[in-house]
Amino acid sequence: MENFSLLSISGTRISSSALSTLPDIMSSRATSLPDIAKPVLPTEVPSPVQALPPQCPGGVLRHGVHNIVISPDCILGDAPNGEQLRWNCTIYRPWFSPYSYFLCKDKESHLETYSFSEVQRDEGQRDSCLPEDTADSVCSSSPSPENTCPREATKKSRPGPDTTDSITFQDILMASKWHPAQQNGYKCASCCRLYPTLHSLKSHIKRGFKEGFSCKVYYHKLKTLWYKEQKARPGDRLSLGSGQAFR
């Protein structure tokens, strides 16, 4: 190694005899040192993409979910007993992920995988959860009686006070009984704003949250208290004295 210490940019000039010995030293060092110029490649592992079965017809794309429906099934080689292995293959890509996932299951196995029917069912449930105003307009615009609104069916099957889910004109008038009578409009019992018609007051209650008002929550709470009081005293109706406690 002392021979290499003579190699310096600012040092003295090396004689030609010393330089002639350097190739021999380098060659001997090169034979003894490990071969680092050639990186050792890891054993090639077949990636999932390379191990994919042959493409089968029937690809479906819907909202980022690739579903390959095999007709009848993808055939992946032969089994040791001579029977052909059949697999149900699905490519699944979540909407929040840039990667796709390849799912395969044997036809005879009972392992559950992500199927396209579940995606359609989830999307159907997501589409059925429309806003209240949109659902009301869709239900009111359906001409045939067969097209029943799923929201109304949910309300009817929901246990408890189904009438407290929506605010009606009767509820608005009942809440206004404990306020001074207005000569030229209807007053909101929550924010005390005055509206010319009863329909405009109801629209304010339903859509007031877009403007920062919580009147809809107030009327819902008020109606829930009315229901609890009617349930506690089923023979009595709400009177003026009992309603003044909600002011």
Curated annotation (Swiss-Prot):
Keywords: Differentiation, Membrane, Nucleus, Spermatogenesis. Residues 137-147 have a biased composition (Polar residues). GO terms for cellular component: nuclear membrane. It comes from the Eukaryota. Residues 125-164 are annotated as: Disordered. Signal peptide: none annotated. Pfam families: Spt46. One of its GO terms (biological process) is fusion of sperm to egg plasma membrane involved in single fertilization. Coiled coil: none annotated. It is found in: Nucleus membrane. The keyword Nucleus applies. Plays a role in spermiogenesis and fertilization. This is Spermatogenesis-associated protein 46.
